[in-house]
Design a protein with these regions (language model features):
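Flexible loop/turn segments at secondary-structure boundaries
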Residues: 92-93, 147-148, 194-196, 226-227, ...
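Structured core elements
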Residues: 187, 241, 253-254, 286-287, ...
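Glycine-rich His-Gly loop
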Residues: 88, 290, 389, 459-464, ...
Length: 687
């Protein structure tokens, strides 16, 4: 295929360039017809260039489908009165939700058909589903555009007519425990002008069919523009927990779940830099916090007023406590080892006096792997549901009997086709970064090719303390079967090695992320895993920032790069507090009102560091309704790199005009988009 530089005569960039606006800021005007025309032209250029690869994309897509079990049924969950599950038909994008009275499966009925809700909608995302305490009413939120502004609906189960309650709210909704025959209270969040969930509201929902709509009551409004409000309910069903938090500070308030109209109770007042989460068992609260150190410790206090916090699990230097789940019998803790970047589930059984009866770790099937505690609605459950997966092992669900220790396999995602998971091998190597820090790099490949350098897809993220723990991908098998190695650079800024790893890759230390990613690339070559001239870099969202910066600095390091809804115009975005997310991101990137911060961000912001040089082939994806990374960021980057390109490699932009930050909502379109992206990757790798 002949590559075409983006500035050839007649290209969108050449046709729409404005000499009076060389930075392409005019693309930020969503109402302009020229903007729509430019994006349409770029999409057409993308389609024209891609046309010869369409047969390969079709092959990848259908091969991917053949590997999957397209008809999917979730595990059943028995609540107090009914058992619930979802089923997705082999030809369906969306599921149906089913239930039956406990012990009477012959009386099953579909109570919510997502297919009907999504019909004739170009985009559909269900933000949340919440069952009333008696399990006879369903509240849910839905977004039909992709801009993450949700509408609240209600219906009686199983076949009531849906009633729209509210629009323009946050995705989550929570029932209080005050239900009567007449109604119950729902809690939800609303946005300010920058789409920050700044307020918590309660609404009395009358169940009578023609009951008048009540006016929502404000519970809490958060004035600090860096703080977001959220609400949830403890597994004990005793308390509603309200968090108002920034990226590094949390305030926790509470309401008795059966008395949501009472005054808020403060469980932890905000302290700058102190993050907190709270859970509950009868008579006691638990507090996970970093007040005494960056790796968190666990405290407890009596439920009574003015009780003081007492340490239960002390801060450690070699592991970070990442989460706590309370049950009647004790706690499950998520604990991340800094040495091997592995999360362990720790079981802590407590007696009625809160003394430790048992302290042990739940066994892992292999390392590295991901082991997660599935949400269990039963506070007194003596059986836990675990989800486990790795780079070579598809997701499996187990029931762990706490009394006998017996693990029972409940479900495993089936994988069909010629490449079985058993034919894969994963390994971890360590890259030495510019300052001597050892950066973990995970790799998965075909076992029969593990002794030779391979074409490689290198993925990275490195922000917000998010950890890229091992995950299995059926779509990834299309690349692996064709001889590609898939590698993940666990760069600083992520959470793979605990809170210090995150802190070492944010704010003034952000440069470490970029050094780490390039060091990972060098380590893969030095370890004879990767062929130096056949490495594609890939990153999404903040990972797009990582990749965008690295291709500016070392374009020769990669034969191509994939930037999916990439955060590229960092300085300009952070200088505009009217955009969604900006003020909440000050603690991640810094506030550029300070000249030194602006200078620092300008030093790496991808769009501000484009140079006339030979760029690798670029596949850039944006979304029109994206409220996290505005469509114009990838569009401007595409335009300016096209102008700067000194080589022949293509610079391609595709903007999805019917979705948001998460891409397509229907699974078949999402899989087809993945196949197109993979076709580009294989082309770039010469496969």
């Amino acid at each position: 295929m002949k590559a075409q530089p983006g500035m050839h005569e007649g290209s969108p960039v050449a046709r729409y360039y404005r000499a009076d606006d060389p930075e392409w800021h005019w693309l930020e005007n969503r109402e302009s017809a020229d903007v729509s025309d430019f994006l349409t032209a770029a999409n057409q250029q993308h389609a024209d260039w891609f046309a010869p690869l369409s047969p390969l994309a079709d092959t990848l897509y259908h091969s991917h489908l053949a590997r999957r079990e397209l008809a999917v049924k979730s595990l059943e969950t028995a609540l107090d009165h009914f058992t619930f599950w979802s089923e997705t038909g082999a030809e369906d994008d969306y599921p149906c939700w089913w239930r039956y009275p406990n012990g009477q499966p012959e009386q099953k009925s579909c109570f919510f058909d997502v297919r009907e809700r999504a019909a004739e909608q170009p985009f559909y995302d269900m933000g949340d589903m919440a069952l009333s305490p008696d399990e006879q009413w369903l509240a849910w939120t839905e977004d039909t555009q992709g801009d993450e502004r949700f509408t609240l609906w209600l219906k009686a189960l199983p076949n009531g007519t849906p009633r729209q309650l509210l629009s323009d709210i946050g995705p989550s909704v929570c029932w209080a425990e005050d239900q009567t025959a007449d109604g119950a209270t729902l809690l939800f969040t609303r946005f300010d002008d920058t789409q920050r969930p700044d307020s918590l509201w309660r609404l009395w929902v009358a169940f009578a069919e023609h009951a008048p709509m009540q006016t929502p009551t404000l519970v809490l409004r958060e004035a600090d523009p860096e703080f977001w409000v959220g609400v949830g309910k403890t597994r004990s069903k005793a308390w509603l927990i309200i968090e108002s938090g920034s990226k590094d500070t949390t305030e926790v308030l509470a309401l008795p779940a059966d008395q949501p109209e009472t005054p808020l109770v403060c469980l932890h007042a905000r302290e700058p830099g102190v993050e907190v989460s709270i859970d509950h068992r009868p008579g006691v609260f638990y507090r996970l916090h970093n007040q005494t150190g960056p790796h968190f410790q666990l405290d407890m206090r009596a439920e009574s007023d003015n009780a003081s916090w007492q340490p239960l699990i002390a801060h450690r230097d070699d592991a970070t406590l990442e989460g706590v789940d309370a049950f009647e019998w004790g706690l499950i803790l998520a604990e991340r080892s800094h040495q091997d970047a592995q999360v362990l589930l720790r079981r802590l059984e407590l007696d009625s006096h809160h003394q430790t009866l048992l302290d042990s770790y739940i066994e892992l099937p292999e390392t590295p792997c991901s082991q997660l505690l599935e949400d269990s609605p039963h506070f007194n459950a003596r059986t836990l549901h675990l989800r486990e997966e790795s780079f070579t092992r598809p997701p499996s669900w187990y029931a762990l009997d706490l009394d006998s220790g017996v693990r029972t396999l409940l479900k495993q995602v089936p994988v069909h086709g010629s490449l079985a998971p058993e034919q894969l091998v994963s390994r971890r190597i360590w890259a030495t970064s510019h300052d001597g820090e050892q950066v973990p790099v995970s790799v998965v490949m075909r076992a029969d090719l593990a002794d030779q350098p391979l074409p490689t897809l290198l993925y990275g993220y490195g922000a917000y303390g998010e950890a890229l723990d091992p995950w299995f991908s059926i779509a990834r098998l299309e690349l692996l079967e064709r001889g590609v190695a898939f590698a993940v650079a666990h760069v600083r800024g992520g959470g793979e090695r605990g809170e210090p790893w995150y802190l070492a890759g944010k704010m003034a230390h952000k440069e470490n992320s970029f050094h780490d990613f390039l060091a990972a690339r060098e380590a893969l070559v030095a370890a004879h895993i990767s062929q130096p001239e056949r490495i594609v870099a890939c990153g999404a969202s903040a990972g797009g920032l990582l990749v965008g910066t690295c291709i500016n600095r070392a374009p020769e390091a990669f034969c191509a790069a994939v930037l999916d809804v990439p955060f590229l115009d960092v300085l300009r975005t952070m200088q505009n507090p009217e955009l969604p997310l900006t003020t909440a991101e000050y603690t991640e990137w810094g506030n550029p009102e300070a000249p030194d911060v602006a200078e620092r961000i300008a030093g790496y912001s991808p769009i501000d560091n484009i140079r006339s040089q030979r760029y690798p082939a670029l596949w850039i994806e944006g979304s029109w309704f994206d409220t996290r990374v505005s469509y114009w960021e990838p569009a401007k980057f595409y335009a300016r790199v096209s102008q700067a390109q000194q080589g022949a490699a293509p610079i391609l932009l595709h903007t999805d005009m019917s979705s948001g930050h998460g891409g397509a909502s229907g699974r078949f379109k999402a899989w087809r988009d993945t196949a197109r992206q993979d076709a580009f990757i294989l082309w770039a790798l010469g496969l």
